[in-house]
């Protein structure tokens, strides 16, 4: 959720923040026609041009903090996994080279990787150690993929992540030192992935549609930062957390104030969007990584990882549950927004027409930034 103060002519100039809307935001016609949210051929082009050529987030190193730890990737139906061995964290196949069975499930710790079907055994580097009853051991190992690391986030894509985020002004706020993974949510969305990003990148709806979130954060003091492949929104606290907007958020307000001994956090939230599909979020004593995985033009899988300081994750379960409930309340509300948007677009498409509305500045500037990035990355002129 957020807004920008950036003119489209400045998108390739690294970081921009706190710029005057009147001076820097030009009228734009970068809105996307309704057909782009439902076209199967275009969807396949997006997967190739944007996702396979993008940063390719696969997980955080905190998913596997100890040697022998493994964590299967839910976004890939456990087809690959992160494994920590003596050399560090590896991304490798979780499919046995014998009869192509999924070997490990979920997360845990192993000395070796053993397929339950025929006991083929691999070491933590993916090399085959033994194949029972074979006179000559096959030379078949698990495929491994090189990784990039930024603040513990692991990427397999071709983009230079460190270069993309080199001038990120909130990098220290998104530092995971002292944190641990608590849980992962998989949320299925019945709408296009671009619609999700659009809702995430605009604050116009926060007050009218989010009674809970809109009484936790204040969009009156938004600060924006833009780069060629990312945007950041930083928002303040609403009314000193004195007026919660829903019973669920009442518990979240109370948990934040109780843990901080009444001292107000420095921000309400920080939302980083790294295109096309990665969101890293800061809340008081919480870091969240959310990634979108398009299943089809009208179906998107959102994998959400929740990280907390070790003290909170281990001993403050009321805090964890309060934050999780507040987050998911807002998530469900965002679903309704996105579903209504795609339903209206589909109605127009069936009518044989397309309509787009103006951007509200500054509250929808983030959506404009995304649309301009999309057109540039896709070389789309429709």
Language model features by range: what are they?
Residues 20-34, 177-179:
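Short, contiguous pre-domain boundary segments
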Residues 58, 103, 128, 213, ...:
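Short clusters of hydrophobic/aromatic residues that line enzyme substrate/ligand-binding pockets
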Residues 53-59, 63, 127-131, 271-276:
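Short Pro/Gly-enriched beta-strand edge/turn motifs at strand-loop
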Residues 63-159, 166:
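Rieske [2Fe-2S] iron-sulfur-binding domain
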């Amino acid at each position: 959720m957020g807004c920008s103060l950036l003119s489209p002519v400045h998108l390739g100039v690294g970081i921009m923040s706190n710029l005057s809307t009147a001076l820097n935001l030009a009228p734009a016609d970068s809105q996307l026609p309704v057909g782009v949210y439902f076209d199967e051929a275009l969807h396949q082009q997006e997967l190739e041009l944007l996702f396979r050529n993008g940063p390719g987030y696969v997980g955080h190193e905190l998913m596997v903090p100890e040697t022998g730890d493994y964590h299967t990737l839910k976004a890939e139906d456990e087809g690959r996994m992160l494994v920590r061995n003596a050399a560090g964290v590896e991304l490798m196949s979780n499919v046995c080279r014998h009869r192509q069975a999924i070997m490990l499930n979920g997360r845990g710790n192993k000395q070796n990787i053993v397929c339950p079907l025929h006991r083929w055994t691999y070491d933590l580097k993916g090399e085959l150690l033994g194949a029972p009853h074979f006179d000559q051991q096959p030379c078949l190992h698990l495929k491994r993929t090189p990784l990039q690391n930024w603040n513990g986030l692991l990427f397999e894509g071709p983009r230079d992540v460190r270069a993309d985020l080199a001038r990120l002004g909130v990098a220290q706020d998104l530092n995971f030192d002292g944190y641990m993974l608590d849980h992962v949510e998989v949320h299925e969305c019945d709408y296009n992935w671009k619609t999700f990003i659009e809702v995430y990148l605009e604050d116009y709806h926060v007050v009218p549609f989010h009674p809970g979130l809109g009484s936790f954060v204040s969009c009156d003091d938004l600060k924006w930062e833009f780069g060629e492949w990312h945007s950041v929104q930083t928002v303040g606290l609403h009314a000193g957390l004195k007026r919660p907007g829903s019973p669920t958020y009442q518990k979240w307000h109370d948990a934040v104030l109780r843990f901080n001994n009444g001292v107000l956090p420095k921000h309400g939230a920080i939302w980083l969007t790294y295109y096309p599909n990665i969101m890293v979020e800061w809340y008081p004593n919480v870091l969240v990584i959310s990634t979108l995985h398009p299943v089809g033009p009208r179906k998107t899988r959102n994998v959400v990882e929740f990280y907390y300081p070790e003290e909170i994750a281990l001993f403050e379960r009321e805090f964890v549950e309060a934050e999780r409930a507040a987050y998911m309340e807002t998530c469900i509300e965002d679903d309704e927004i996105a579903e209504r948007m795609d339903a209206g677009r589909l109605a127009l498409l069936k009518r044989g027409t397309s309509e787009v509305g103006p951007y509200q500045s500054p509250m929808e500037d983030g959506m404009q930034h995304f649309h301009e990035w999309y057109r540039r990355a896709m070389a789309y002129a429709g």
